[in-house]
Amino acid sequence: IKTAKFTPYDEESTGEKGTSYLKLNPKMHRDTGFYIYKMEPGASSTPHRHGGAEEFYVIEGELTDNDGTVYSAGDVVWLAPGTEHNSYSENGCTVAVFSESREDPISQKP
């Protein structure tokens, strides 16, 4: 993970700046299966809805979900299908993710 070449999320299509991913199975869509997700300091994920369940393990750093929940290194999280959220990382983080299906972007609520 430390020396692998991560692929930046396409900022124009996703709105994400400072995020990247490493797919372990390149034949699967970037949001499905198992992948490593990195957030640079100050990065935010795009608000999205999960089509299936998602599980993630915080390898290093910390991220804060839009509901204020803070996840730190060593935390394991399960998100139910249909969960809507986005995350922010003040100091950056690396997360191992398993997602059952693709994410759908949602517009931010006022």
Per-region residue spans from a language model:
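A short, N-terminal "cap"/entry segment at the start of jelly-roll beta-barrel domains
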Residues: I1-D31
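Short beta-strand/loop turn elements enriched in aromatics
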Residues: P26, M39-G51, S101
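Short histidine-centered beta-strand/loop micro-motifs
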Residues: Y35-Y37, S45-H50, D67-G68, S87-S89
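Short acidic (Asp/Glu) patches
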Residues: E40-G42, E60, L79-T83
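Glycine- and acidic-residue-biased ligand/ion/polar-headgroup-sensing regions
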Residues: P41, H50-N66
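Short acidic-glycine-tyrosine-enriched beta hairpin
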Residues: D65-H85
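Ligand-binding loop in jelly-roll beta-barrel domains
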Residues: P81-Q108
